[in-house]
Curated annotation (Swiss-Prot):
The active site is at residue 65. Transmembrane segments: none annotated. InterPro entries: GlpE_sulfurtransferase, Rhodanese-like_dom, Rhodanese-like_dom_sf, Thiosulf_sulfurTrfase. GO terms for molecular function: thiosulfate-cyanide sulfurtransferase activity. This is Thiosulfate sulfurtransferase GlpE. It comes from the Bacteria. PANTHER family: FAD-DEPENDENT OXIDOREDUCTASE, THIOSULFATE SULFURTRANSFERASE GLPE. The lineage of its organism: Bacteria, Pseudomonadati, Pseudomonadota, Gammaproteobacteria, Enterobacterales. The gene is glpE. The keyword Transport does not apply.
Length: 108
C-alpha cells in the first residue's frame, strides 16, 4: 500500500473487534488520559520505538487523533516506516467517543 486509507469509526471498531488491526492514538498525553479508545496504544515520539518493535509491519494499523486530520500525517509516516496497511480514522476520538461511549478508557 503506497497510500493510507481513510476509515470511519464503525469500520475501525469492527476491525478492532475482529482483531484485524491495531489502534494507535496520537493525541497529547493530557487528552489521552482524559479519555481514549479502550484498546488504543498511545503513540508518541517516545513510544514509537516500542510500538515498532512489538508490532509486525504486516499488521494493519489504524491511527486516531482528535478529529481525523492529524492522523493523516501520522498514517503516512507509518507507511514510510514500512507498515504495509495503515488507516486514518475519520472523525478521530471525538467521533469514537460519540459512537462508542462504553468503550472509552481513562488514565494514561
Amino acid at each position: 500500500m503506497d497510500q493510507f486509507e481513510c476509515i470511519n469509526v464503525a469500520d475501525a471498531h469492527q476491525k478492532l473487534q475482529e482483531k484485524e488491526a491495531v489502534l494507535v492514538d496520537i493525541r497529547d498525553p493530557q487528552s489521552f488520559a482524559m479519555g481514549h479508545a479502550a484498546q488504543a496504544f498511545h503513540l508518541t515520539n517516545d513510544t514509537l520505538g516500542a510500538f515498532m518493535r512489538d508490532n509486525d509491519f504486516d499488521t494493519p494499523v489504524m491511527v486516531m487523533c482528535y478529529h481525523g486530520n492529524s492522523s493523516k500525517g501520522a498514517a503516512q509516516y507509518l507507511l514510510q516506516q514500512g507498515y504495509d496497511v495503515v488507516y486514518s480514522i475519520d472523525g478521530g476520538f471525538e467521533a469514537w467517543q460519540r459512537q462508542f461511549p462504553a468503550e472509552v478508557a481513562y488514565g494514561a
